[in-house]
């Protein structure tokens, strides 16, 4: 009997110890959670204190609200009704709403008021060739020297005109009517003196480019050969 009583006492004591241990663990975990929450609360700053005054636009009179008359009763009946049409007009994506003016279309592409609103000229092939010739005018006449042209791009705003000679100008400074053409390129091509000068310059450039190449070396070999091998 004594052994049975001792075993029962030991079992009850062990149960009590386990229950006490579990309660201590639960209490410790709850204390840790509270301590962590307090730490987080201390880190977060207070944005609005009791002494802080809200600005005027947060007051109730500026906040928009809904009136009871504006609320729709039985909204489900409107949703289920097939004949219901919205009062707000729906515009298509490619159609602009009325009252919106497209200002970009009315703006003209000009050089500005300082240049008397000079419009942008259309760049045709003949106009491009004339502009390229004007940029290379240093090569047209060996007796005239011009400032170097640095811009490679075509101008956007420009005008083309013809100089009208006065009666006091000497006849040598005028271009005869037979030699007048529509473009600058045509006038240069119809001038025989210019054409001979351009041909001479072209041959000089070709000679300098071909120097030291295969063709020149072959010609040199032919000249070095003796007369009986030629």
UniProtKB/Swiss-Prot annotation:
Its keywords, alphabetically, are: Nucleus, Ribosome biogenesis, rRNA processing
Assigned GO CC terms: nucleolus; nucleus
- Report the locations given in the UniProt record: Nucleus, Nucleolus
* Domain of life of the source: Eukaryota
Instruction: List the GO biological process terms.
Output: RNA processing; rRNA processing
Give the start-end ranges of region Disordered: 209-230
Indicate the principal place this protein occupies in or around the cell: nucleus
Q: Where is the composition biased (Basic residues)?
A: 210-230
Q: Does the keyword Nucleus apply?
A: yes
Recorded hits in InterPro entries, A to Z, give: Fcf2/DNTTIP2, Fcf2_C
What family name appears in the similarity comment? Belongs to the FCF2 family.
Query: PANTHER family given for it?
Result: DEOXYNUCLEOTIDYLTRANSFERASE TERMINAL-INTERACTING PROTEIN 2
What does this protein do, in the record's words?
A: Involved in pre-rRNA processing and 40S ribosomal subunit assembly. Required for the early cleavage steps of 35S rRNA at the A(0), A(1), and A(2) sites.
Name this polypeptide is given: rRNA-processing protein fcf2
The coding gene here is fcf2
